[in-house]
Structure formats: C-alpha cells, structure tokens
Amino acid sequence: MPHLPLASFRPPFWGLRHSRGLPRFHSVSTQSEPHGSPISRRNREAKQKRLREKQATLETDIAGESKSPAESIKAWSPKEVVLYEIPTKPGEKKDVSGPLPPAYSPRYVEAAWYPWWVREGFFKPEYQARLPQATGETFSMCIPPPNVTGSLHIGHALTVAIQDALVRWHRMRGDQVLWVPGSDHAGIATQAVVEKQLWKEQGVRRHELSREAFLREVWQWKEAKGGEICEQLRALGASLDWDRECFTMDVGSSVAVTEAFVRLYKAGLLYRNRRLGRWMSCPLTQLSRRFQVENRPLPGRTQLRLPGCPTPVSFGLLFSVAFPVDGEPDAEVVVGTTRPETLPGDVAVAVHPDDSRYTHLHGRQLRHPLMGQPLPLITDYAVQPHVGTGAVKVTPAHSPADAEMGARHGLSPLNVIAEDGTMTSLCGDWLQGLHRFVAREKIVSVLSERGLFRGLQNHPMVLPICSRSGDVIEYLLKSQWFVRCQEMGARAAQAVESGALELSPSFHQKNWQHWFSHIGDWCVSRQLWWGHQIPAYLVVEDHAQGEEDCWVVGRSEAEAREVAAELTGRPGAELALERDPDVLDTWFSSALFPFSALGWPQETPDLARFYPLSLLETGSDLLLFWVGRMVMLGTQLTGRLPFSKVLLHPMVRDRQGRKMSKSLGNVLDPRHIISGAEMQVLQEKLRSGNLDPAELAIVAAAQKKDFPHGIPECGTDALRFTLCSHGVQGGDLCLSVSEVQSCRHFCNKIWNALRFILNALGEKFVPQPAKELSPSCHMDAWILSRLALTARECERGFLTRELSLVTHALHHFWLHNLCDVYLEAVKPVLRHSPCPPGPPQVLFSCADIGLRLLAPLMPFLAEELWQRLPPRPGCPPAPSISVAPYPSPCSLEHWRQPELERRFSRVQEVVQVLRALRATYQLTKARPRVLLQSSEPGDQGLFEAFLEPLGTLSHCGAVGLLPPGAAAPSGWAQAPLSDTVQVYMELQGLVDPQIQLPLLAARRSKLQKQLDGLMARTPSEGEAGTQRQQRLSSLQLELSKLDKAASHLRQLMDEPPAPGSPEL
C-alpha cells in the first residue's frame, strides 16, 4: 500500500452541518442567506475593482515569463512557540488544569511527560502485569544498539518510531512488554573518532599513550556521547525500560562475550590461522564489514589525496615492467601491474599453459627486476591470456587471487607492507619504513634507471577505499582468529526455509539463502585497543623454528594457565602467558545482544521469561551482518532461535533519493526536525565536527542548498507519524522536511478539534459507557461507524506490522471524517438550547477512542489531550494513556453501518460538484441557492435526508429538490453528477457576466498555453505515459468546464432577469 501522502493535507470538504431529522419533500435548510440577495451598489463597485485588479494580474502572469524555481521557494515562517512554564519537578505529573493554548506548540505538548512516564514505571513489564486489561502474554524486543560514535541520525529515528509504536500498542493491549535499551561500543569507529579528537585537541597520537591511558580517554568520551544518545531516545518518546539499559562493553556483556568465545572454541568453531584480509591504514586494521569499503570506479588516470601521504597519488594506471629471463640477456617477460609498490613481494610470474607466446619459457627462471633473485615462471589456468601481456606477477601476501594461486603452487608469501602502511624490512634498506605510495614512486624510478620500465597507460579500474579513513584498502597476511560458519549458517538457512524464522518483507529471503549458501569463515580479530580483548593466551616457550605457536583459551588468565599446564605437562606457575592484544570484532558482541542483554550466560528470570524475543525490527542493511550472526550465535549458544520474526525497514534517503551521508551534507539530525534549526545552527554543528577543511566547505555548501531557510520546528509526534507512514514493503524511504512539516499541521488540526470538543462538553458533562451509546441521527451514526472502521483498520495494521495502514486510517478519520465533516455538522446542533444529549456523547467517544488509537504513534500529543477529558463513571481511569486499553474493534462493531457510509459518499459527490461550480464562477462569499434533480427515487430520498449538510458542506445557501422532469430554472448554472442526477446553482444577481467573462478568458488562455506546451513537448526519458495522459485529460476537462461556464454567462447576459425564483 502506498504511504500516506502527508505532503498534502488539503481537506476534500469544508465541513458538514447537521440536518435535524428527515425533511419533507421540497423542504429546505433554514440557515440564513446573507449573501443570497442582490449585491448592493457599494459592494458591487468594490468587487468590480478587485476583479479588474485580479484580471490585470492574470494577464501579466500569462504574458510574462514564468518564475524560476528558486524564486518560487518561500522561507518557512516560524510558528509561535508556547512554553509550559508551570513549575514541575522532573518525574512529577504535568499540570493540565489550565486551558489549552490557542495553537499547537510541540515544546508545550512534549514538556514534562516523559520523566513522569519513567518514574511511574509505565514502561516496565512488572507494572503492565497489574493492568486491568492484562493478557498474561509477553512481548519483548531489543533496540538495535546505536554506535556511541555520535548522535542519532534519522535512520535511528525511523527504527525508534516503528519499534515504539509496536511496543506501545502491545502495552496498551495488555501484554507484558520488555523493550531493552542499549548502545554499541563500535570498536573501529569509536577508536578512530577518539584518535582524531586527541590529535585535534591535544596533538597526541594513540601510540604515544599507554593502552590503559588511551582506554581512559575512550571511556570518558563514551560517557559524554552515551548520555547524549540516551537523551535523544527520550526526546523521541522511546518507551524503553531504562532500568535494564546495557552497553556492549559493560561488565555483563564482557562476561557474555568471554563465555561465548570459550564455548565456541571448545566446540571446535573457533580457530587461529594465517590468512589474507582487507586492511585499512591510519592505523591499518582488519575491516569487518562490506560497507566500510567503498568501491570507487576510476575511468583512467585519477589523482587522490590519501591520509599520511605527502603528495597526491595517481591511480587508474597500468605499469609495464620487464622481468629478464635468467640466462638469456636479450629475453624478457613484460608484466602489467597497477600496484608496482608490491613488486618486492613477488614470488613468481604466471602465464596460461596454452599461451603459445610463452610455451618455450615453461619451467624457466626469471630475474626479479628489483631484488635480482630468480623467480619461477609458472603456468596456471586462472591467468587470462587476452588481458594485457598475458603474464601476471604473483604476490601471495597482498592479493587474494595471488594467494590462491600461490597455495596451488606451494609458493611462500612475502609480507612487504606493514600494518602501518609502510614498507617492511623484506624490501631492503632503501625502501624500509617508506610510505607504500612514496615507495611506489621510488620503485618506478629505479626500474627506469635499470631500463626495465616499459611505460604506463590509462587503465579503468575499481579502487577499494575505506569509507572511514579515506585510505586505499590493502590486503595483508596475518594470524588471526576465525569462526567456522558453515554449520551454523546451514542451520540459519534452514530456519528460514522451514518457516521457523520469518523475514518480512519476504523478498529478503533470497539474499539470506544466497549469503548463507556461500558463507565463509568469519575473522573476528581486530587490531585495536578499544573493544573486548580476545581471551586467548600465547604460551611463551622455546620451540623449534617452524613449529606452530601454542595458544590457549580461558575465561581468565588463571583458567588459561590451567589449560596450558595440561597441554605442556609443566606446572602452570612456571609458564609465561601473553594475552592476545587484539580485540574482537564489534559484531561479535552485538550478535549476542538478544540474550546477553537479558543476563546470559546466567539463567536469569528475564532470560526465562522474555527469550527468545518476540520480534526483531531493524534496517534491511543489517540483515546479514547483524541479524544473520545473531541467528547463528543465538542458536549455537542457547539452543534456540533468538527471535522467530524479523521486520526490516528500508534505508532512509533524502528527498532526491540520495543516501544520507556526512560527506553530502544531507544528514538530518532528528533534534533539528523536532526543535527546528536556523541555517547558522546547522552550519555551526558542521564546524564543530571532525571534518577536514576541504570536506567541510563542500558539505556546508550542500547543506545551504538543501536547507536554504533552515529547518522548521515540527515536533516529535509529527516526525514519528511521518516516518511510520512509509510502508516497509517497498524500496528506500525518501524523506523531506516539508513532509514532516505538513504532519505538524495535522497535529494542529487534532489540537483544534480537541479544543472545540472540550469547549462543547463543558464542565458538567458526564460521559456514558461506550457500549451504551447509540446514535440519535444520521450524522452521529455515520461518524461512529467511521470510528469503528478506523479501529478495525488500526488493528489490522498493527497485527500485520504495516504501520502505513494505521497512519492512513488515523489521518483519514481525524482530518476528513471528524474535523472536516462531523465537527462542522454538529456546530448548529450544539448552539440549540437545550442541547440534545446525543452529539456531546458522540464527540466524547470520538475524542477518547480516537486519541487512544493515536497514542502509539503520537504519544505526547495523545497524552496531553487525553488527560483533559473527563473520566467515564463507574470505572477508575488509567493514570496515563500509555497504559490505557487500546480500542478493540470487537467492542465497537455494533456501531458499524457500511450501507450508511456508502450512501453518504453519494452526498459527498454532490458537494464536490457544487464546490467546483463555486470555484469556476469565483463565488468566494456568496451563498447561492441549489437545486438537485434526480430520476432515481433512492437519490431523491437520500438528498432529502441531507439537505442542510449539503448546503453547509458546499458553502451554499438553501438546498432544495427539483421534481423529476421539471424544467431547469433560468439563470442557474447546471452540472451533471451522473446520468440520473443534475445539479443547479443560482447565478442571477450573484455574478456579473461582464466582469467574469474576461476573467474566464484569461484563465482559459493560460490553461490552453499549458496544454499546447505539453502536447508540443517530447516526453522525457522515463516519463510515464499514463501520467502524461492524465495531465492532458485534466487540462482538457478544465478547458471544457470553462467553456461551459462562459456559455452560461453569455446566456445570462442575453436573458432578461427572471420574474421569480423557484420555490425551495
């Protein structure tokens, strides 16, 4: 289902006034007609002047050039900010005894509620177990722990909005809900940020500090940033159980991580091996995720500035190097390479065995062009003879393909690039210690001096860049720890295939199955200081060269010493142990989160009660690297799937469809949308970050373009509602601030509706129980039926977890049913004295039930308004709407009247026709009389029952019925509703044809110009044919209406004034 079009909140109807009872045939509405009489001379002259000015404006617009898009952009006007200024201590209930402010103000509404919710314990499952509507069922979720590397972005806000809506709905239903908060230590990201900050503020590098001193700096930074993230979660209204908050580096998590490592090792699923891996420098460390790698396509020669390198480096080039044939001075094999800096690590040259150019050299030796040592020329079917010269250098220590080839031929790798990105001692003194790209230039220079450089040429290529450091990715050989994933992966794939694990949307199943069918072992070692240090110890002892190191694993050094004593047969006290300095991949601890957050490995009450989790909701980009690993480790370590259902939401993009990125300057901070931010504030935040000056200038310019007037204050509820209005079934979510701003207008509409309702109820109003309320008229019955339908649609949306169904139903009820129809319909009834008892009771039920339906999505606004409603007698009210019962469709089913709704939609069609006629003849203030004529008896009876609402809704005067077959009145505009229904509107005395005809001609000319331009223009590539045709049809229809209106006006000029008007 398409998401709710929040960008356009124009109501289809102005409103509907109430019709008391069923009028007799030919009966009319009794409202006054102040504008139905002929226009006075003074008013006529003023109106003619305004119309002449308007006509001149129209003609100027038609003749002049259209404005550029930039000129049409208007700055948002800041709304009046109302503050809650009643002294209230944090945790005390907000004072709602005073009147509502005249307009919705997010800061006023959102003040004081959250601390009170937390202090009262509404978010704790222990409280929910005591609710009257308690079901005895449990519902548990954990928040995807955000990285402590900074503030939450709009993607986090989407996660919170969806999860909190589901959590609040389950809580109001009566389930015992546990939603666990937490944050992730984010090893690589956090260490990089802190290192950058240390250098920026203190001029200190990490290695100039001890490991302990550096970790103290990280912990201090975490405490500052972690608190900021918690405050953002509170501002978003996340109903988390803060007493159960956890952090992936706290004591409980550390115990769980160590236990998991030990158990996996004992199960034979953890091992240590020397393998090639992708590394980044500054400092060089093992990369853990594919999205830390940006594959940048290069069309040819491209210069890049890299961290730590003094000059720009050229890429997209193929260097040709000659390898002399040993024993033949004039013979050589030319090899093409994009990485001449790895030449010192070459151990062979390979050719295809069937390449006739090199058949005579099979088995021969070549001379290394730099080092001079002999290299074998080997044959391998992996070589592509038609690429380059058909000969390739083999560097097993720095290329995955070369590593496989070297293994096939028994070639030993040579590590020539160190972990800090410099050249190793194996390269010789002349290269050792040089930055690898500085060494490149020196190597090419030496090759040229020796006459072995054969030139370079442009070479399109894809260059892997680290998205964090901006450096080129290197492949290095190192001994590290690996998790065997084949067996666990097969179980994860089988869980989805069997239906034990449900992925939604279901199209993600294909990626899941493909990934697990091709899964390799998982490298969990990271060369960092920040993180869980690996609980593995090297037994330091003398052993013969070539023997493998002896490693032991233990929950503590004492336990590891006992294991080492058993392995070596020596007393543990005599053994020297060195703990592995590396830390575990951040994903390792994150993969344990669903059960470590509940106390595992201890058998805690929370673990027994809330594990497995009821649902995992997260971004689709985390499906494999987080969700997949949670399933693998959860099943292995606990014997059960960590959850049975996974709900995946799309990635948030900007309104242009671009990924939100700091480098693009289009990242939206939820706080800026909630509270608003001027352009100066947005720019100052950029300057306070860690961007380098060149990048800062680009980002600042992009930000000014996207938000030229800053960001308006929209509030938390508007942001949450907007995010939830986008369905999860489609592609990426493209979000614009204007969409959220439109939803703020929707909040204001609800606010004004409750102000009206509270005023209408008065202080002495006593609500009836909902089950005793029965409608006393058609309009009451209609709105209660729509309310019951809304409750049913909301339940369907929550059960299917398609929140766009919920937002659509609520938006339609509050705006189009309640505000635009029923509230207008009930106004004349409420003015009667004495006021009938039915409408106030209906108003109360709409407010009470409507707010409870809304509460999971707009918790602050719903609480603020619901607290001001009078309680129903006979049952103690819930202290908060957050723990009040969610409306059940079953309990409201007796209000459903689908046939009445269908019939009333016919009335709304008449209103649309009347409103179109008013717009065509520009009857802005006049209240023309209306006649309806139908040849169908059913329509006649329907219209007779709704004469007053028809007049009110269409802003017309008296509405009457014209008998079937009767002649059309003279001087009245006519419009068909259908083949059987005609609508007539009085024009005589209300419209001056001499003024209106030129205006219609100007409007027609403008529309004709648009139509001609559209027909002459060649459709752009990708433009939908149906959209173009719809636009053409719309313009042609409008032109037809104008022509018909002009014909009516000319006829009105030719006809003498009617001696009398039809009797209504």
UniProtKB/Swiss-Prot annotation:
Residues spanned by motif 'HIGH' region: 146-156
User: Any idea which positions bind ATP?
Assistant: 662
Give UniProt keywords alphabetically.
Aminoacyl-tRNA synthetase, ATP-binding, Ligase, Mitochondrion, Nucleotide-binding, Protein biosynthesis, Transit peptide
Q: What do the Gene Ontology cellular component annotations say?
A: cytosol; mitochondrion
> What Gene3D superfamilies does the annotation carry?
HUPs, Isoleucyl-tRNA Synthetase, Domain 1, Valyl/Leucyl/Isoleucyl-tRNA synthetase, editing domain
| Matching CDD domains | Anticodon_Ia_Val (cd07962), ValRS_core (cd00817)
Top-rank taxon of the source lineage equals Eukaryota
Show the catalytic activity: tRNA(Val) + L-valine + ATP = L-valyl-tRNA(Val) + AMP + diphosphate
Localisation: Mitochondrion
Per UniProt, the transit peptide runs over: 1-26
Please tell me which top-level EC class this enzyme sits in: ligase
**E.C. number:** 6.1.1.9
Q: Where is this motif: 'KMSKS' region?
A: 659-663
* Keyword ATP-binding among UniProt keywords: yes
Which segments show compositional bias classed as Basic and acidic residues? Answer: 42-56
InterPro entries associated with the record:
aa-tRNA-synth_I_CS, aa-tRNA-synth_Ia, Anticodon_Ia_Val, M/V/L/I-tRNA-synth_anticd-bd, Rossmann-like_a/b/a_fold, tRNAsynth_Ia_anticodon-bd, Val/Leu/Ile-tRNA-synth_edit, Valyl-tRNA_ligase
> What family is reported?
Belongs to the class-I aminoacyl-tRNA synthetase family.
Descriptive protein name: Valine--tRNA ligase, mitochondrial
State the organism's lineage: Eukaryota, Metazoa, Chordata, Craniata, Vertebrata
Gene field: VARS2
